[in-house]
Amino acid sequence: MSSTAPLLTPYKMGRFDLSHRVVLAPLTRQRSYGNVPQPHAILYYQQRTTKGGLLIAEATGISDTAQGYKDTPGIWTKEQVEAWKPIVDGVHAKGGIFFCQIWHVGRVSNNTFQPNGQAPISSTNKSLKPAVRANGIDVATFSTPRRLETDEIPFVVNDYRVAARNAIEAGFDGVEIHGAHGYLIDQFLKDQVNDRSDKYGGSLENRCRFALEVVQAVTDEIGADKVGIRLSPFASYSEAADSNPEALGLYMANALNKFGILYCHMVEPRMVKLGEKFETPHSLRPIRDAFKGTFIAAGGYNKEDGNKAVSTGYTDLVAYGRLFLSNPDLPERFEIDAPLNKYNRETFYISDPVIGYTDYPFLPSDV
């Protein structure tokens, strides 16, 4: 396959010159012991770095209430910021562009992850039913959340702002606000979760208010040219569905245009559940057409799908998760049409610093 395949063409994303359009999607790996990024992440991200390639770091907690999983990284303490620096430096040493995904899980948590064993915070006090974890084995139980009071919300918005500033201090090129997959921002966006009667609930405009206040705070802090957001209007992860996902996606796309943010990263409608593709009549096209910045599509893409999505103008960039996890040299494999390593789901979330993490083979150097 020649390097003129659409996925392998250069792209100018704001001030960043990308050499290709294959993006490392944000992937939770649960190897940041005690919520602190570890030295083994240097190799993991470096392996997946190409000169001019865009990488989005795994979901990273913004505060001590943001956690809901074992050993996920944070960026709210000095220790965490310092621990990220060599990881970011490793990506930059190979010419990569690195964004930090800033995250609050909201009610997708339980009190064992919370300071002083308190209830997780959310838009609502409706609790989640126990759910099988993404590894298909463990069952997660969730504590009944505490509905945030109206006057508390600005403090949470500020946590995102501080996390964004910390990410820039750690050397990241920008941040991606995690507004997808049933986590805190999504708990405000989706009408199946948000049952508030204040200015953050009810109408579409009110449900989007929290997300847009976060965007405002983060862009004010670090500049719109360093800010992206990830959204999944069509998804129903963690019981977070919406009765009119198209309207939600379009409203957000148009509202985001006013801030001039760098990119919008959307999850395909076919990805209703983690790792499972469904046929769907829905499309991201109207949302993509409405949004004026760079558009990134994600969710179950292979090489052929990705090339078609770029060539037809359906998206600018394509984010790959599981394929990039198991193929550290994915852009090169796409370029020469090499076979792909199969991923092993059983090692996605184990604590081992090597197995299932940095031990996926590269192509032989003589290929």
From Swiss-Prot:
Alphabetically ordered keywords of this record: Fatty acid biosynthesis, Fatty acid metabolism, Flavoprotein, FMN, Lipid biosynthesis, Lipid metabolism, NADP, Oxidoreductase, Oxylipin biosynthesis
EC category: oxidoreductase
Binding site for FMN: P26, L27, T28, A59, Q101, R230, G300, G321, R322
EC number, UniProt record: 1.3.1.-
GO BP annotations, alphabetical order: fatty acid biosynthetic process; oxylipin biosynthetic process
Coiled-coil zones: none
InterPro entries noted in UniProt: Aldolase_TIM, OxRdtase_FMN_N, Oye-like
UniProt: substrate binding residues: H178, G179, A180, H181, R270
The protein's name in its UniProt record: Putative 12-oxophytodienoate reductase 11
Species the sequence originates in: Oryza sativa subsp. japonica
